[in-house]
Amino acid sequence: MATETVLATAVSNGKSKGCCKSGPGYATPLAAMAGPREKLIYVTALYSGTGRDKPDYLATVDVDPSSPTFSSVIHRLKMPYIGDELHHTGWNSCSSCHGDASADRRYLVLPGLISGRIYAIDTKTDPKAPSLYKVVEPKEIAEKTGLAFPHTSHCLASGDMLVSCLGDKEGNAKGNGFLLLDSDFNVKSRWDKPGHGPLFGYDFWYQPRFKTMISTSWGAPKAFSKGFNLQHVADGLYGSHLHIYQWPEGEMKQIIDLGNTGLLPLEIRFLHDPSKDTGYVGSALSSNMIRFFKNSDDTWSHEVVISVKPLKVENWILPEMPGLITDFLISLDDRFFYFVNWLHGDIRQYNIEDPKNPVLTGQIWVGGLLQKGSPYKAVGEDGNTYQFDVPQIKGKSLRAGPQMIQLSLDGKRLYATNSLFSAWDRQFYPEIMEKGSHIIQIDVDTDKGGLTLNPDFFVDFGDEPDGPALAHEMRYPGGDCTSDIWI
């Protein structure tokens, strides 16, 4: 169903050449850390799956403490259709193009995970009020590549964009792979070579210095789109593998089976320093942080570096509750990583200066199924039950659990939303279907470590004009530690 949205007029890509002009982003991760403080955040907000017959939208949130509209939504760009399930976002150009003076970080790449559309959003003309530039239709994508369910996008130094797609149009995982778009969002081809598609799709990260791209595994869209069923894991409808590709050729070199220690490996990040051949992946269901690294023979291996133990619980659907690590990120100086436990409700900070041995330096509970007042209780080793204290902000209780996170360039502010995916939200946290999502800010101690909830920042998507909405991924206009790749 269409709603009215005016498409922005195509604008020049600013293709001026010159020795004094550089491309988008920053020359190095440490240069990015010294960049300006964030003033705006773009957030995917959706009504898909909520029962409200409204289009999803891109919310612009004011995060400038000196602004009179601080901690509020100042603009909403509604999509022209209903039912997209906006999810993750990326850029048409980022720090991987820093050496190209003609490149311009102008368009936010906004896939609809369920509809299969990909929107190009102009954020340059008016950063506070983005506009719709172009729509890539799912029919064209399917006809030219056989791909559907677009998820993660990354810009390439060539000017093209690469988008992971999680299945074919019928929702089968076997049809998943990688979509290549040109600089004006025209469908070029599949990136992966014929016969080299991954077992399952989700996230990916590339590192040109090691001629490698690694992708992760969620599950078959026909399974996860209906909610989570543990039997589907046993039935082979969810993944536990990392796929190692030759970059940029698109040939699969190796598949790493993480086994039961790596069920549902979702987000993946290399260290930001492009000379480092290591990084991490967060395994959601197993609730492990897994380090991957390159061997001397050019193969790749892995090891579990953090295990979040499941908690014994009462009154829940299972006798034990996993943490469910659904997102993590790495600070730009590669000193810390942060991850969330969506079900337990905590966010953790670890020092990773020794990548093999992360050290817990901060932890805070900001929601979860086990907060005080919940019908669910954790059971200690002594048999006594307990629940976690979760603070209120501005008189409002924190709902659901921390889900997507975004870190300021200087590493001192961590933002968190609480919606994972509408079908899973409804299953695990039905409250946010009626009360909506929120964004919180956590102040970070980058000297000694530590996390503190900021009492002055709270964006309540329960108060949106068209009704409570679900908020997911966040992006800054100038790039961030999960969008930009240095080469």
From Swiss-Prot:
Phenotype when the gene is knocked out: Impaired fusion of polar nuclei.
List of residues binding selenite: 19-20
Gene Ontology CC: cytosol
UniProt keyword Acetylation present: yes
InterPro entries referenced in this protein's UniProt entry, alphabetically: Se-bd (IPR008826)
GO molecular function, one term: selenium binding
Induction trigger: Slightly induced in roots by cadmium.
Keywords: Acetylation, Selenium
Tissue expression as described in the entry: Mostly expressed in seedlings, leaves and stems, and, to a lower extent, in flowers and roots.
A GO biological process held by the record: polar nucleus fusion
Cited function: Required for the fusion of female gametophyte polar nuclei.
Family according to the record: Belongs to the selenium-binding protein family.
Name used for this protein in its record: Selenium-binding protein 2
Organism of this sequence: Arabidopsis thaliana
